[in-house]
Regions:
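Nucleic-acid endonuclease domains
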Residues: 1-134
Length: 134
C-alpha cells in the first residue's frame, strides 16, 4: 500500500464520494471534471484506480470477491475523511480492508430494498489500520 498526498480543491459536490473522486483525479491528472457514474466493469474512476471514501458502496450483494474479479480496476484508492490522503491498494489489500471495515445494509424500499456492502464511517481503528500498512 502506498499513500498519495492530495491537492486541495474547492468543493463542488455535497456528496463525499463525488468530491473524493474529483480531488483524487485532480491530484493525479490535473483535470477538474464532472464525477461520472460509469459501471464498475468499465474500468477505474481514474485510469485503473477505483476511488472510494467512507460510507461508499463497495458492492451490491455481499460477494466482494466476485465483485473484485469482475471489476475493471486494478487498484483501489481510499480517500480519507478530510480529503488530504489517498491510500492506494492492490486488489488483495482492498479485499482485506473492505472485509474488515465494511458492513451489510439494505437499499431503501423506494430503491428496491436490495442488499449491499458499504464501508463504515471512518474511525480511529480504520485510520490506524491504513497508516500501519502504508
Amino acid at each position: 500500500m502506498t499513500t498519495i498526498t492530495l491537492k486541495t480543491l474547492a468543493r463542488q459536490y455535497k456528496n463525499n464520494g463525488q468530491h473524493a473522486e474529483q480531488v483524487a483525479r485532480y491530484t493525479l491528472t490535473g483535470e477538474i471534471c464532472k464525477a461520472d457514474n460509469k459501471p464498475f466493469t468499465a474500468g477505474g474512476d481514474c485510469g485503473d484506480i477505483q476511488i472510494k471514501s467512507a460510507r461508499a458502496t463497495v458492492c451490491h450483494g455481499t460477494d466482494i470477491k466476485a465483485h473484485i474479479a469482475m471489476d475493471g480496476a486494478n487498484r483501489y484508492g481510499y480517500v480519507n475523511a478530510d480529503f488530504t490522503v489517498m491510500y492506494l491498494m492492490s486488489a488483495d489489500e482492498w479485499l482485506e480492508f473492505a472485509s474488515l471495515f465494511g458492513t451489510v445494509t439494505r437499499e431503501s424500499q423506494s430503491n428496491g430494498g436490495a442488499v449491499k456492502m458499504r464501508l463504515k464511517v471512518e474511525s480511529r481503528e480504520m485510520t490506524e489500520w491504513l497508516r500501519a500498512r502504508a
